Amino acid sequence: MTLESLIKELNTVRHPHAADKNHPLYRAAAERWLESLAMADITTIDARLNPQHVYPQVPALSGSGPDSAGAGRGVMDLLGVTREGRLAVIELKASEDIHLALQGMDYWLRVRWHMQQGDFSRYGYFSGVELQPRPPLLYLVAPGFRFHPATDTLLRYILPEVECVRVGLNEDWRRGLKVVFRQ
């Protein structure tokens, strides 16, 4: 297969209006596709979010410090800030995943810790933004019918200071993001 034919195939099958929705290239890396659409207009998720300050695939470290031996590592889908300066952890899932709420909460705890340490300004994140000392917002974003049934139950047990917003998207989100509910 030549590079030209590969590019042609990608343009045909990795497209929002592709005829074959079951093609492996159409279905591959769905979460990254969703992430790219959210990055293109983060205000679709919430109008309060500042489109000038959204970071994809942010390393999330935990432990007694970012350089501590044995620190937990992860990668947040999106880290943003509201127009008022409040941090926002945005966890995306393109399909049903029982870990969505717990993963989001894990990243929320890490972001709060780094916020309290002053790490974001120290490392050049959110340049020119005065970050609020309030706890970060947590957004759990997925197609509306793709939230795992256990998500609501798990959310009842998270810390009371966590302001969590479930954002349900249209099922055909590849054609453009539309919010069908916010809870």
Give the positions of each predicted feature.
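Charged, terminal alpha-helix-loop-beta segments
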Residues: 1-183
